[in-house]
Each structure stands twice: as structure tokens, then as C-alpha cells.
Swiss-Prot record:
Pfam families: DUF489
GO-annotated cellular components: cytoplasm; plasma membrane
Keywords: Cell inner membrane, Cell membrane, Cytoplasm, Membrane
Domain of life: Bacteria
Lineage of producing organism: Bacteria, Pseudomonadati, Pseudomonadota, Acidithiobacillia, Acidithiobacillales
Gene3D superfamilies, per database record: HflD-like
Transmembrane segments: none
Major localization class: cytoplasm
Name of the protein in its database record: High frequency lysogenization protein HflD homolog
Length: 221
């Protein structure tokens, strides 16, 4: 499940992409929980990243640079100076929890099997409906998160407005996005990502993020 080997030359780039993918999910979760936002195309990109079981390319698995632009731009400030306000502190909390859960998922065979079963079921549904945003597909992936990731620790407590957190559709979107964040965390870990090393190589990761943004200017929204 979600497993492939990466050439050494791509490992640092893929670590930057993986962290940006984690942060993208955290940003979208926060926006739904606080504002009831409807992420639309970004949610669809995140769903497709969950379904990319055998992609050999991290960027293709995560979507494209445009979908990661905001998180790539935010990655450097968070790595270099830490969170500058309560919103960024919350994003960092979500992101660190997602990276930890990615590690623990890979070590838990039953949770890994449950994720694979849920992803394969969603793939079959998409083959029928052709739309990854179909309500039943989002609900199914959310259920996969609950059943597979809910047994792991730490538990992610999402903060926000109760009217959004209690809405079944918003709650399903949030859980699906958390699953996509764990998928990005798995990519990061497969590229050699480790939290202590991230602090030591933060300057190099920032350089990778800046180069990715600079080489894809045409994708700006």
C-alpha cells in the first residue's frame, strides 16, 4: 500500500513535496473547520492522491505544484521561524500529528490493510461514478480514516466552529483530507523523512520548495 522506492537524487525534493502535501491537508482541514469552506478542486486533488496506490512519482501522486503552491510558500516560514500566530501553531500541530500517524500506520499491518481495502473500494466506485467528489466516495474514505487511523495515536482533535464540525458532509471532508495528509506523510517518510532530520535540513528543504515554485510559475492560480 502506497509503497515505492525513490532514486537518491529525488529524495530531498520528494521530502519537500511530502511535507507540502501534509501542510496542504492541514490548511484545508482548518479552512473547513473554521469557515465551512468548500475546497472543490483541491479536495478532488487530495482524494486522487489517496487513490494513487502505485504512483512512481511523488508530484504526480500529490497532484501538481499549483495545488501545493500555498503550502510550499508557507513551508519555509514554518521551518525557519516556527509558527507566527495561533493559526500557524494549529497548522503545525495538525501537520506533526499527521507525520506521526503516517509512521505508525506503516508499522500497523491491520490498519494498513484497512486503508488499502478502503482505497480499493473507492477506486471501484470511481470506475462506476467517474466523479471522486461523489458523496458516497467521500463518506467511504472518511469511514476508512475512522476505522484505520482511529485506532492509532495521537488522535487529531480538529478545532473549529461547531456548526461545521457537526455537519456530516463537512466532517466527512475533514476526515478524508486527514487521510490525504497521512498519504503525503507516507510519501515523505518513504523519501527518508524524519522529524529530527527535518530541523537539521530545513534550509535545504526551503531551497527545494522555492525552486519548485520558481520552476512552475505558469501554474499560479
Amino acid at each position: 500500500m502506497w509503497s515505492f522506492l525513490l532514486p537518491d537524487a529525488r529524495r530531498r525534493r520528494d521530502r519537500a513535496l511530502g511535507l507540502a502535501g501534509v501542510l496542504r491537508s492541514a490548511l484545508l482541514v482548518q479552512d473547513i473547520a473554521r469557515n465551512g469552506a468548500q475546497p472543490g478542486d483541491l479536495l478532488q486533488t487530495c482524494i486522487r492522491s489517496v487513490l494513487a496506490l502505485d504512483s512512481k512519482d511523488s508530484l504526480r501522486a500529490l497532484g501538481d505544484i499549483d495545488s501545493l503552491r500555498h503550502s510550499l510558500a508557507l513551508l519555509c516560514p514554518l521551518l525557519q521561524r516556527g509558527p507566527g500566530n495561533a493559526r500557524e501553531a494549529e497548522l503545525l500541530r495538525y501537520s506533526m500529528a499527521l507525520t506521526t500517524l503516517g509512521k505508525r500506520l506503516l508499522k500497523n499491518a491491520s490498519a494498513t490493510r484497512r486503508v488499502q481495502e478502503g482505497v480499493e473500494q473507492a477506486q471501484r466506485q470511481i470506475a462506476h461514478f467517474a466523479d471522486p467528489m461523489q458523496r458516497s466516495i467521500v463518506a467511504g474514505l472518511a469511514q476508512t480514516y475512522t476505522e484505520a487511523i482511529g485506532i492509532l495515536r495521537p488522535r487529531i482533535i480538529v478545532s473549529g466552529e461547531s456548526r461545521f464540525l457537526s455537519d456530516p458532509d463537512d466532517a466527512a471532508r475533514i476526515r478524508t483530507l486527514l487521510l490525504s495528509g497521512i498519504r503525503a506523510a507516507v510519501l515523505w517518510r518513504q523519501a527518508g523523512g524524519r522529524l529530527p532530520a527535518t530541523i537539521l535540513e530545513r534550509r535545504a528543504l526551503c531551497q527545494e520548495a522555492e525552486e519548485l515554485l520558481a520552476t512552475h510559475p505558469q501554474l499560479t492560480r
